[in-house]
Amino acid sequence: MAAKIRRNDEVIVLAGKDKGKKGKVTKVLATGKVIVEGINLVKKHQKPVPALGIQGGIVEQEAAIDVSNVAIFNAATGKADRIGFRFEDGQKVRFFKSNGETVSN
């Protein structure tokens, strides 16, 4: 199945503690999860690794969020939107279901 949410897409969170927040997708995982910039921040207890120059301490980082809890953000309408696929000039492209505009990559 083709990916409806891809890296660098602007998404809006639909459910969870960060509901309503927008961010850019930094990574799409094969497990059906995405990592979004500035969303779902968790505190990780980092162990120091002197050989690599890594300091220890409590580090805040983004955790994965299920792809079903985010939707692509349509800048033209200012709302969350759904994605469809169609062929244009022999290429499979994504488009917004609400207004039919092609999603830029």
UniProtKB/Swiss-Prot annotation:
Annotated GO CC locations: ribonucleoprotein complex; ribosome
Transmembrane feature ranges: none
Recorded hits in Gene3D superfamilies, A to Z, give: 2.30.30.30
* Gene Ontology molecular function terms on file: rRNA binding; structural constituent of ribosome
Keywords on this record?
A: Ribonucleoprotein, Ribosomal protein, RNA-binding, rRNA-binding
Query: Is Cytoplasm among the key words of this record?
Result: no
Q: List the disulfide bonds.
A: none
Q: GO biological process: what's one of them?
A: translation
Complex formation: Part of the 50S ribosomal subunit.
- In UniProt terms, what function does this protein have? One of two assembly initiator proteins, it binds directly to the 5'-end of the 23S rRNA, where it nucleates assembly of the 50S subunit.
Family statement drawn from the similarity comment of this UniProt entry: Belongs to the universal ribosomal protein uL24 family.
This chain belongs to which protein, by name? Answer: Large ribosomal subunit protein uL24
